[in-house]
Amino acid sequence: MLHIYKASAGSGKTYTLTLEYIKLLLGYRDEQGRYRLYRKSDAQHRRILAVTFTNKATEEMKHRIVFQLDILAHDTEKSPYVDGLMQLFGCTVEQIRGIASETLYVLLHDFSYFNISTIDRFFQQVLRNFTREIGLQGSFEIEMDNDFVTASAIDRMYSELSDVDQKGLLNWLIHYAEERIESGNWWSLGNRSERKDDLRELAGELSKETYKLFRNEILSQIKDKSVLDDYLKEMRRIRVEFESLLRKLGEAAMAVLERYGLSPDDFKGKGRSWIQYLKKIVDGKVEPPTQTFRANVGNRDGWFLKKEIPACIDSLYEELNPVLQEMVNCFGEPYVRYNTAVQSSKYIYALGILVDIDRRIEEYEKEHNVLLLSDTAGILNAVINENDAPFIYEKIGTRVNHFMIDEFQDTSKLQWQNFAPLIGESLSHDHTDLIVGDVKQSIYRWRNSDWSLLNEGVQSLFRPSQYSERSMNMNYRSCACIVEFNNRIFGEAARLLQQKLEREIEESALVEGSFDVKIEKAYADIGQRVADSNLLRSGHVSVTMWESDKKEDFYNDSLA
């Protein structure tokens, strides 16, 4: 069973994690679902992998488990876990003390196999067993300095621009620079000492998972610039065809009005009538029709005021409405394709240059026998996708039965894709796994974290019978006034933000559904309860509003 804990701040997450780990160390669940103590310790810590986000958190978790295990072994009655463990396993204090003492002894004498680490470190350990598959020597080093390697790759690219076979790249760099300047952005071909180097900033995209998830496909398809040239031509064709069709429809609609001696000002609303939209289309503007325009297509009663309905309304409606309907239809799937063409055309030169930088980074890694830390998750993803879990365990020389992932809201999509098959293998053998996190505390988007995994991604991967969800909403840390303040302000903020998002989706004519109640769902468990021990504690909440729009003023005032 995969246990998913959604643990809000101060809800006892640390206590729960430690308890769950110790439960796995001391006992097991039999075929009837009952928990039993091990008769003797069998180095269970070797078959449990607990991962978290930082080295500090890793050390704290190790210390906490050893410390609590020591209390269970030597001062059992004082352990905060002993009563729960006795009830769970149906055993005595002496039995808990005995197995805890033996387990602690085995753990301390086998400490190097105490598998609590950061996600990155675990991935590196696995990769070292697949050096042949990834094309590196067994002695490869992990390179932490992405900027240095990127700068070296760009320097090499610059030095090769005079080569005959790099003429295409030179032209792309020129086009990219021109595009940046025309769009009002700065452009700098700097060197390592300069803070602003446009290509180095662009190369930062290579470490983002939005690129890594499609990297292999991109590199295989873009082997030369002619592919991208053909793509640009196709995107231009899509844009021109859509804009031409839309303008023709606008002109056709205006022609109908002219034949009947009417103009947009004759419709309900006069100069602000819904059909004034036609003028924008005829002028070549591409923007979705308003909700009012959409509502009046197919509804002739809303076209004119009752006292101003022209005698030709029936024939006008029969001629004009089909044209208007076709215009609205343009802003379905055709508009999505058009927008895709417009947006992708803006970045196609950047993509071509990125591919060249990426290939030179790969050359640097092979020449220096290093692997960028930011590449480990992506490379391991390819390894795991090509092999099943038993083979991976065979390669790394150990088998993990139980997985525990802390701070799961900071896990990235690639990292989860690496863990998911291993957890799936664990669940297929009826083992226990644990995920703990809080979407409201996801603060590492700059490191590709994806809070939606905890919100909905994990649940969609497994059957309902394979996982359980629990919201830990008791706050043991804060007094009543703080908890109540947070409940009210964040609950209302989530509701207002969801409404704002829905309005923007509606106004932009985007397809509805994908963001429906997404924010409200993420904050569905925002409400916390106050622990009895904190009900009488006093506290204070102060809210200060700053009128200045300058960030510097905000920082200075908030730190004062």
Pin down the residues of each PLM region.
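Core structural elements
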Residues: F111-Q124, I174-G184, G190-T210, G352-I357, ...
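P-loop NTPase Walker
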Residues: M1-E133, Y364, L371-S374, I379, ...
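Helicase-core coupling region on the C-terminal RecA-like lobe
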Residues: W186, S193-D197, S471-A560
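Short, polar/flexible loop-turn hinges at active-site or ligand-entry regions and domain interfaces
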Residues: E31-G33, L37-Y38, D42-A43, I71-E77, ...
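Conserved helicase NTPase motor core
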Residues: L2-A9, Q44, L49-F53, A57-T58, ...
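Alpha-helical scaffold elements adjacent to nucleotide-binding pockets in ATP/GTP-utilizing enzyme cores
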Residues: T16, E20, E60-Q68, F122-N129, ...
